[in-house]
Amino acid sequence: MNPKKPKVRLWSVLTALTAILTIAAIVGNMIANQYATTLNVALNASTYKIIKGNTTEDTEYFKAGFASDEEREAYEAELCATVEAEGAALLKNDNAALPLADSAKVSLFGHGSVDLMYGGTGSGSVDTSKAPNLKEALEAQGIQVNQTLWDLYKSDSMMKNYSRITPASISDTLEANTQYAVNEAPWSALSSAESSFAEYGDAAIVVFSRSGGEGADLPSGTNGTNDSWISGSEGSGNYLELSAEEIELLKNLKALKDNGTFKSIVVLINSSNALEMDFLNPAICGEDYGIDAAMWIGDVGQTGINGVGQLLAGTVTPSGSLVDTYLYDNLANPAMYNFYTQAYPNAAEYNLLTEGADVQGMYSVYQEGIYLGYRYFETRYEDVVMGTAKAGDYDWATTVAYPFGYGDSYTTFAYSNFNVTESDDAFTVTLKVTNTGKTYSGKETVQVYFQSPYTDYDKANGIEKAAAELCGFAKTDVLAPGASEDVTITVKKSELRTYDANNAKTYILDAGDYYFTAATDSHNAVNNILAAKGYTVAGTNGRMTEDGDASLVWKWTNEALDATTYAASANGTAITNLFDESDPNKSSDAPGSVTWMSRSDWTGTVPTQPAALTAKETLAADLAFTQYDGTEADSVEMPTLGAKNGLTLASMIGKDFDDPQWETLLDQLTFDEMVNTITLGFHNTAAAASIGKTATKDENGPQGLTAALTGGASAMCYTSEDVMAATFNVDLINEVGKCIGEDCLAMGYSGLYGPGINMHRTAYSGRNFEYYAEDPFVAGTICAAEVQGIQSKGVYVYLKHVALNDSETSRRGVNTWLNEQTAREIYLEVADKAITDGGAWCVMTGFNRWGATWCGANANLLNGFLREELGMRGMCITDFSGSSQYMDLVDGLIAGSDIWDSPMPKIHTTKAANYENDAYIVTQMRNAMHHILYTVVNSNAMNGWSASDTLKTVLPWWQTAIYALIAVLAVLTVLCAWQLSKALKRKKELADTAPAVDQK
């Protein structure tokens, strides 16, 4: 009988396989640990457990307002539709084309009709896979929709060949702009459905959609800085003009309207980026496309399209007002020449990076100054009407299609009994609003504007003044035909202040005449003020577009220049220049001088090409990634670490920021706990066992709670922020905020990366959908209302991105240059209102630099402006910082940054270890922890916690699983190796005892 052959080959293979798997698991664990923060957030994995103390107190500090998720979701679905219905702006309604007749039969055209823009892309994107579509929204109102045409647009071939193209990833590079394309279907592709048009001919409803998103600005074609970015049928490369196929569509619909197939043509503008409006005006574009009605609807959110259906059917009357100036040619905006970033021509000489995650050698200049949007178009218009010297060749009527604040209605309204009274710190505006129509009920938005004097002092000291500035607004209730409502609007006197950056170096109130007016839009406001000054259309040879109403104007005179009343903030902090280093005409790094745009010389200062700057040695030095040199290391005593004082974070509930007990609590923190919390703040704040601090979860976003980056839960997607602002309804958006807070509370989130507070500097910013408006007053007022609502549920907001992150191209480190008046009056004003009026807890700083200094390392911005002037007590988080060295840990801590939005320890956590013995940096870490902990202890993260509860750190379940897998594989490897050893030994024994082979 032959002995059993040992299985050497089998055990060799199994030993090698298990050894390889063991090594792979170990390496995988090492990689996973690098991304532990991200995995914990995405997998909802806890790193601690709570040890409950003995208490009977109610620890539900922030309570839900809904009895069930179903109740909350149903309410929010209606709320989102209401926001859209109140925010959409009716632009044109000839021949009473809208509302549609009962049971009207309509055909929907344009790829956008079946593929709406619900929101943008990037970190603010939301899941709208189950959102209703336009067809469903219309059918819910009894409108019948052409099924044949709908099915054609929805067919696989049409969706494959003619879908909107958006940049696929967040790249931040100029080249990303080339990826945008409208890609509308040509008219010939609709031929198979043409026989169905007549039956559904009550209206042809055309949807023009444009996408935007994080990491890529929209292409504008030739703009003085670059050539066409889109070729072929897309036309000039301007993404916001109609494409050749869209124009072809309109031409063919006009022909069908002319032959009686369609009764009317209605256009819906589904975009947060302002399209060029020339196609709505035959005198401008040179062709009549027969468009009867047009409505701007922005990005509609999850259920907002239902609100559009209500508007089209007449269930609701439009009452929204534009929050951007809509132009015939977007390149008429002076900001366009400096919108896309430029490279310093000598960047290579100083080894300045011009692309990637650490940009140094790219810059942008806000040369237009305060003249953003209507502040330019209406101010230059007034100067032309008044015959002011150097106003130049400017024609408002051929430049502006629809002014800021414009919004039509199905009914008409009249204003009367206008009156203004003055008190110590405010003006109270009252007037009567009457629905003068005979058929439709509706709401009216009342806007109050002021004009401040443009004085010789201003001209001598480089102060700029707009012809009109929004300073108050209100929305009536629904008024039936013939009904009236008395409206009261309070205007703070501080709205009249202006910043004098060159002489007084603080806010001043100029001497002279101030005008207040109630108006329907910014242009109407200027015409009213011109009327009060005695100007008429006839008297200006037609330079004035229409006569204003002087009865809606009130004049107030300030007898003497006042440089003291507004020279201190509400908390008593002296206000003076903080941002000279961002002004190329003042900065010690000055890369060249800039001529700011000025109404004193429009012809000589309106840009005709990008501002030219050149890098120099001092600028290059200040663009280095780390500025701190360690000389302050021993300037302070090393803080106490790891003390056993017995306090927990919950014991600080209700304590003031300056309560001395905070020092006792902070003494308990360990160095590792501080580093972990500060450097790994990606969508969370970490647990800290020494003080019983729970971990918190933070999430995007601007349109409501989302989880675009972590794949977690998402909730109601509201409309884009511009639609929210266009409601001009503070109470409504406060309710939106409360519901966003409810979503966070229900899903376990304590922080929200939003609202977005950057400005619509041009129509081409990729993230305009995340930001409210071109005007800081309406943006700040609406934002403050939303913030109040969100935070009422214990959710701390991070206003993003403070500040000047108004474009996407080269955003990671771009050098942004502007003067202080512009910074304060335009780009910081939203944060000011959101913090002082809305009580916003936190901010997220921008990727960009102020001059040479990264936002997160700008002490004057974070500590000087936000904390000292405005009194903000919460934390400052960076934008995503996992791969950027310029978002430096130590420089940021010194300047007031508290937490880095980073999921990996590669850069910042590793760097922090080098400063364990640097008392100055450890002190900055302690200060940062104070801001973080003060925020968290006042949030819903403390729900369920009492002062007697403690916390114990544990391994997250996924880490335990990996360790278990490694252990199992290691044991299997050992067993297989043992079996292999036995097999080899047996093989040798068999070889030794085998009979000798005959060698004959």
PLM feature spans:
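Terminal connector regions
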Residues: 493-566
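Glycoside hydrolase catalytic-domain context in secreted enzymes
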Residues: 1-499, 508-517, 522, 570-1000
